[in-house]
A protein has these predicted regions:
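Blade-level signature of beta-propeller repeat domains, shared across WD40, Kelch, NHL, RCC1
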Residues: 356-421, 639-698, 709
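Repeated scaffold domains used in trafficking and secretory/extracellular systems
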Residues: 45-52, 92-106, 129-146, 174-207, ...
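Entry beta-strands of beta-propeller and related beta-repeat scaffolds
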Residues: 59-62, 106-110, 144-149, 204-211, ...
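Noncatalytic modules at the cell exterior or secretory-pathway interfaces
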Residues: 762-778
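Residue-level signature of beta-propeller blades and closely related beta-rich strand-turn architectures
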Residues: 66-68, 114-115, 153-155, 214-217, ...
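Beta-propeller blade signature
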Residues: 75-82, 159, 224-240, 279-285, ...
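A short helix->beta-strand "capping" segment at the edge of beta-propeller domains
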Residues: 27-46, 438-440, 444-454
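Beta-propeller domains
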Residues: 61-94, 112-126, 161, 171, ...
């Protein structure tokens, strides 16, 4: 078979992925918000994430992974037909795989340890032949027609013959072999010295193999997200170890050839991050260049790298590629290079944890990491003693391509320098500012105690700064935002959920069951129910299961404080944070223990529901409340929230009847649940609220208030008043990124006699937290309105 025919076959195969496949109407299983509960995937491990999703031979092929399982697991290879019928392949051997590549010459799909030909025959490379957590594939450097590379998460490197599947070990995988494990492949004695671990991407081009990892074995990574971690490396030939390119956390490595694994001379891209911002590395003509992008979400931070899954840059059949990174969808031009660095743009923010994605027919398929049996390091007192889910599970999310631009807003921030030493003439990395209307640079010289604010012109795509004087402690921070386009009205998707002023509320608590039952246990005050994969909610007599649920998933009390000023949270490190109320009527539900405050809604992702607002709450190892962001405000009387088969579940249903398909009524008609996608929450409405750090509070001279959340709100103003018979100056200070670095914003002289002074904040001003300082002792009110 000649190369021309290979190319024709590839075009035919990709045609199935990009447009020829049409959904068969009337034969699809039940779905809500693009999630089919019948397609949920389960394992017996502490996590069940989606490692790869690839269209091949008309079907969709999917693999799942468990956490740190280099020698196999209960995870499966799935084959999904155009009618969305799921087949669990008997060849499954599990593990922690996330690799995928189409080998053009042999017309085989490599996905995890599986090799699938044009007739959907599956061959397996067992863990005994290739131990390790398989994270990436790439084209071979010297024999690409006959071999492919595999890399592992612990820096292992193999080459595999695509015909015989013979494995050659080039760099030994970093996992210690169990005593009862007998490898069938002679393992290399070369053990990598590349810093970091927790490998992610792999790609070959320009005579080298490029590899990324995003973790480190330093014990500080479990608590301090600023710990040095991760590496970007390259490899040239057998006998070599990985050569360090840059010591930061990196994830995806790819280029214009994408799933084909590399090319001869094209560019390569790698996306990563540090405590300051995102880092984009570009290889062009043998030279590496670096760029910086802002972070939309901080839930992906954490020096251990566990919170990221596998960020990707993939072809979805559009003019631009799609990049997922730090909670945002991004346009990524196919021709992006150091010489042509134009076109990267934020599209919208998302809440799902996405491991891989692809175009299949007329929709995008996002493979998610939805519900993990283990909370890993993601525990905190505000959640109470709730037990984690009974069985790990995840699902696929099908969306129209247009939805990539329709989810959440993308206010973002990042730093180029953060408490760094600089010299006159030092130039910053180029920092992306295109795609946002409001673009502000903050030049903070901590050593010389100066702060300068600059508005970045609208025609600038990449902002670059040149240092004018030396400093031993210098920061350059960029904040970015657009106008909020949502209103305050909830979408009809939430019709049937009880409102805060409803007298009757069919609420209750729930938890995913274990023991492979694959149901959701749900208990109201009086009865016990179970929800199954067909979305049937049935009353069940099971006293043991009911007692277990009530004892393991109670709604905790007294995990937050409510006072006249605002919502006060004291986190696990003793830090104090204040949040606005969207509706004070929720106070009574919280006080009575009728509303869950915090719960994990996706793997290692907590959501906070307090005062009528949902907030995204990063894990404590990603700095927790310091990086909090509001998602949406609402008037829903939600008792409990969580996940099941990839769906977001809400309890607290109105007694009124509704035809909303998102409301699943029980078979006895006494209760119900709301089901949808976690990213439906954006449709509840824009974040709003009122409150402040002080309300008629006695404060001493130069006392500073608790931090009060400012990020993610619009139409903001502050009102100041005090009780003294003289004018008093109040200082307003900002923490731009939630790093604890406070800068002076403005001072306001507030007149005597309890006369209010009000200040409206301009739309271009964005900061994570605000605090107030009184220059004299007084009883003061600092009251903020976010409308």
């Amino acid at each position: 078979m000649n190369r021309m025919r290979y190319g024709l076959i590839l075009v035919w195969v990709m045609g199935w992925a990009l447009g020829d496949l049409q959904r068969i109407k009337g034969e699809e299983p039940v779905s809500l918000s693009g999630i089919y509960p019948s397609l949920a995937m389960f394992n017996n491990e502490n996590e069940c994430g989606t490692g790869a999703v690839v269209p091949w031979n008309g079907d969709l092929w999917v693999i799942t992974y468990g956490p740190h399982l280099p020698f196999g697991s209960s995870d499966k290879l799935y084959q999904i037909s155009p009618t969305l019928q799921q087949t669990v392949r008997s060849e499954s051997v599990g593990g922690t795989p996330a690799n995928r590549m189409i080998h053009e010459e042999s017309q085989q799909l490599f996905i995890g340890p599986y090799v699938i030909d044009q007739r959907s025959n599956v061959r397996v490379i067992p863990p005994t032949a290739m131990p390790g957590r398989l994270t990436g594939n790439a084209r071979h450097l010297t024999d690409p027609a006959n071999k492919v590379f595999f890399a592992t998460m612990e820096e292992g490197l193999y080459e595999v013959d695509v015909h015989t599947l013979k494995v050659t070990s080039l760099i030994r995988d970093g996992n210690k072999l169990p005593t009862n494990f007998a490898p069938t492949t002679p393992l290399s004695q070369l053990e990598s010295k590349l810093p970091g671990y927790h490998g992610k991407g792999l790609y070959s081009t320009q005579g080298r193999l490029i590899y990324a990892n995003n973790g480190d074995r330093d014990p500080r990574v479990t608590t301090d997200p600023t710990t040095p971690s991760g590496a970007l490396g390259e490899w040239f030939k057998a006998g070599d170890d990985w050569k360090l390119i840059r010591r930061n956390q990196f994830t995806e490595v790819t280029g214009p050839k994408g799933i084909l694994g590399g090319n001869t001379n094209g560019p390569a891209w790698s996306i990563g991050w540090d405590a300051k911002s995102l880092i984009l590395m570009v290889l062009e003509d043998g030279k590496w260049s670096s760029f910086r992008l802002p972070k939309v979400s901080h839930s992906y931070d954490g020096a251990h790298g566990w919170n990221t899954e596998w960020p990707r840059i993939r072809d979805i059949g559009e003019e631009d590629l799609l990049m997922t990174m730090h909670g945002a969808f991004w346009r990524f031009p196919k021709n992006f290079s150091a010489q042509n660095p134009t076109g990267i743009r934020p599209r919208s923010a998302y809440l799902k944890v996405i491991g891989d994605f692809c175009r299949w027919g007329d929709r995008l398929v996002l493979g998610c990491d939805d519900s993990a049996k283990s909370e890993f390091l993601n525990t905190r007192k505000v959640k109470g003693n709730i037990d984690s889910v009974g069985q790990s599970q995840s699902n696929l999310w099908f969306i129209e391509p247009s939805r990539l631009d329709q989810l959440g807003p993308t206010p973002a921030s990042g730093a180029v320098w953060l408490h760094d030493k600089v010299q006159p003439g030092d130039k910053s990395d180029s920092f992306l500012v295109a795609g946002w209307k409001y673009r502000t640079a903050w030049i903070v010289d901590h050593e010389h105690k100066t702060t300068e604010r600059k508005e970045i012109p609208g025609d600038v795509e990449w902002f670059q700064f040149t240092v004018e004087r030396s400093s031993n402690d210098f920061s350059l921070i960029v904040t970015l935002a657009n106008d909020e386009t949502r209103n305050s009205e909830a979408d009809e998707t939430f019709d049937g959920v009880a409102r805060v002023d409803d007298k009757a509320n069919h609420g209750g608590i729930f938890r995913i069951r274990g023991e492979n039952k694959r149901t959701l246990a749900f208990a109201t005050d009086a009865d016990y129910y179970e929800l199954d994969g067909e979305l049937k909610l049935r009353k069940v007599k099971d006293q043991g299961a009911e007692e277990w649920l009530r004892s393991k998933a109670p709604i905790p009390k007294d995990v937050i404080q409510l006072d006249a000023a605002s919502i006060l949270i004291v986190d696990d490190r003793g830090r104090r944070w204040r949040l606005p109320r969207a509706n004070q009527a929720f106070d009574s539900f919280i006080a009575q223990g009728k509303q869950r405050i915090c719960r994990e809604v996706a793997t290692e992702r907590d959501m906070l529901n307090v005062g009528g607002t949902f907030f995204e709450l990063p894990a404590e190892n990603a700095d927790g409340f310091a990086k909090l962001r509001p998602i949406a405000s609402h008037s829903l009387q939600i008792t409990d929230f969580g996940s099941y088969r990839g769906l977001l579940v809400l309890s607290g249903i109105s007694a009124d009847t509704t035809t909303n398909p998102h409301i699943i009524r029980s078979d006895d008609g006494k209760t119900g649940l709301w089901l949808g996608a976690i990213d439906d929450l954006w449709k509840l409405g824009k974040p709003v609220g009122e409150g402040g750090p002080w309300k008629e509070q006695a404060v001493s001279k130069n006392e500073v208030s608790d931090p009060y959340l400012m990020w993610g709100y619009s139409n903001r103003s502050i009102k100041l008043v005090h009780d003294q018979e003289k004018d008093i100056a109040f200082d307003i200070e900002l923490d731009l990124m939630g790093t604890g670095d406070w800068i002076a914003y403005t001072s306001i002289l507030v007149p005597s006699g309890k006369k209010e002074t009000q200040l409206s904040f301009p739309p271009q001003l964005h900061a994570r937290w605000l605090r107030v300082r009184a220059r004299e002792a007084c009883t003061a009110t600092a009251w903020l309105s976010y409308r």
